[in-house]
Amino acid sequence: HHPGLIFPLKDYHAIAIDHCHKSYMEKYYPHLQQVAFLPIGATQSRLADVIPYEKRQIPLLFLGTYESKDGMLEKFRALCRKTFADPKIRQEFYDLGMALLEVMLAGKESANGERVEIPMEEALAGIVDQEKLQAGAYGTRDFAVLMNYLYLIDKYVRNARRHKVLSYVADLKVPLTLVGEGWEKVPL
């Protein structure tokens, strides 16, 4: 969404779908007059009664966009080729993307010893070389622009986590209905 948010328009408002998204936009796009929070996902309608689990026609409905890992990595390679003409910058950017992918997939240890997700912003801040960033080695000097360039890595990680949850549910033999673009690509 970065290309649409960078312009310092007068009276510019945005809507965020979660609190982290809201904080992110407020931090990196201070020219926005207001960022409103609109909780869309997993929100219960006040107009309808909750159907008891045993009476539901669809026991578990899983919504999402599903893509193949190889396809997403190829899209990232294509983005590198398209965005960076200089082979050195292209390789620096690709290597940074792969390092980010590893860090995000590995997660981090929480205070109670469990593995938890690392948000892209935190993971990238931990691995990006600030001197290289300020020198433009990754094709930009702006951290928000760099994160936008790397959106496919974040998408890859979210997709991998989605597949992991689906595999877990399938292993439990819970009846599952998948809905969303690319659902047929899910190998269950």
Task: Indicate where each model-derived feature is located.
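Nucleotide-sugar donor-binding catalytic core of glycosyltransferases
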Residues: 18-188
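A conserved, positively charged/aromatic
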Residues: 4-15, 28-30
